[in-house]
Design a protein with these regions (language model features):
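Charge-biased, low-complexity intrinsically disordered regions
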Residues: 1-223
Length: 223
């Protein structure tokens, strides 16, 4: 990416969550969505191939004991998620690599998100910045809330930890993004966000977000 790194925006944390997890953060940056019909650039496909070579079967087995994956596994348990049933994003990526014999390219946005989590252990999500109402934050779901709009919107269990803005739920923590907040391939402004759990260095979070934004910028260049 040319020029300075994008500006990090610190999100808000609900008081109850902040008291329970003082080091919990949600951080985001603005990025550009590649113009359709953008394809994953050669440099990004080559990075995926190199990363796949590093994720052998032995690495996948020991991955959970590395500091950053271990921190996410511990946090999963603290918020009621079983990391052996719902794998942390980096472990899910490692398993996908073993199943397919490599990292499968799924387009510039998904590939940039994949590179971020594989290189740093920190998962990054993307939402349509134009559909947000104010900064992102973390809070528990309220009674009667749903993920998205319309009759098919999923009901949310009260207390489940969410990524939210002033208008309501944006995504389930470490899970699905609301359909009405997902990136639109015809809109250029993306909001990339990462959730930093206790034990994850701030540098890893910044590298994940900046690296993802940089990869997306490359996707608008030569293929």
């Amino acid at each position: 990416m040319s020029g300075a790194d994008p500006v990090l925006q610190e999100g808000w944390i609900d008081r109850e969550l902040a008291l329970e997890f003082p080091a919990l953060r949600i951080v985001s940056v603005l990025a550009r969505n590649p113009s359709p019909p953008a394809r994953t650039p050669t440099v990004l496909r080559e990075r995926l191939a190199l990363l796949a070579d590093r994720f052998s079967g032995a690495r996948a087995v020991t991955l959970r004991r590395e500091p950053v994956p271990a921190a996410y596994r511990a946090f999963f348990r603290h918020v009621g998620l079983d990391p052996d049933a719902q794998r942390t994003p980096v472990e899910a990526a490692a398993l996908d690599r073993l199943v397919h014999g490599g990292f499968v390219s799924r387009g510039p946005l998904q590939d940039a998100l994949l590179v971020a989590v594989v290189e740093t252990g920190v998962p990054v999500w993307a939402v349509d910045d134009a559909r947000l109402d104010g900064p992102l934050g973390l809070r528990g779901a309220r009674a009667g809330e749903r993920l998205g709009e319309g009759e098919y919107a999923a009901d949310l269990a009260p207390g489940r930890v969410l990524v939210a803005d002033a208008a309501g739920p944006v995504a389930i923590l470490f899970g699905e993004v609301a359909p009405d907040r997902r990136p639109d391939r015809h809109r250029r402004a993306l909001r990339l966000f990462a959730v930093a759990v206790p034990g994850v260095p701030a540098l890893h979070v910044e590298e994940a977000l900046f690296g993802c934004a940089d990869a997306l910028s490359d996707a608008d260049g030569p293929r």
